[in-house]
Amino acid sequence: IDTTKIVMLAETDIVEAVAERLRRYQVQNVVLDTVMLAKSGDPLLSPDAVVALREHLLPQVSLITPNLPEAAALLEAPHARNEQEMLEQGRALLALGCEAVLMKGGHLENAESPDWLFTRDGATRFTAPRIHTKNTHGTGCTLSAALAALRPRHPDWAATVAHAKAWLSAALAQADTLEVGEGIGPVHHFHEWW
């Protein structure tokens, strides 16, 4: 197994069991998509599960991918309102023991969508123009899946993030061509083929 992706672990016992297995089997290249809140802002994890995630799982994973509300929940801090606060929170998350943190800045009110990658070597900014589409359902999940899929092909997380973010930007740019259902639709995962 080259890479593992973990998504929403709602209960403390599940978080602890996954953390124990990661330790036991010394799993490498683990991407944790920190799904913790519904779009409405309602918590999807119990408070105890958030503590277990922070204390037991984060030190076992290679990369976490929080958006700004998720980072705030993990740190029990206010939501970052600008890139300076993103930098502070990204560094604080890295200090919890994971190898890397990708802070996603899509919740900022910028003309571009800035993301910051934090590693022991420093911080790297990645930007892309903000794409105005109603089809954004699953964007974070899609990005973490792309990161997990691309990691074995690239020498480090910075190169992996650059390729995954470029791919996701193209998938968002083509999302309106899908015309799938009503309401918030998906990004165009297959934009490279059709």
Show which residues each predicted segment covers:
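Charged C-terminal helix
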Residues: 158-194
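Glycine/small-residue-rich loop that forms an oxyanion/phosphate-binding "nest" at active or ligand-binding sites
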Residues: 1-59, 63-66
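Conserved phosphate/ATP/ADP-binding segment of small-molecule kinases
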Residues: 47-123
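Glycine-rich beta-alpha junction loops
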Residues: 10, 36-38, 70, 105-108, ...
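Short, small-residue alpha-helix embedded
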Residues: 72-73, 134-157
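Short, charged, surface-exposed loops that flank catalytic or proteolytic processing sites
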Residues: 79-86, 152-162
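Nucleotide and nucleotide-moiety/phosphate-recognizing core
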Residues: 17, 23, 122, 157-159
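Short pre-catalytic strand/loop immediately N-terminal to key active-site residues, enriched for Gly-Thr
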Residues: 123-137
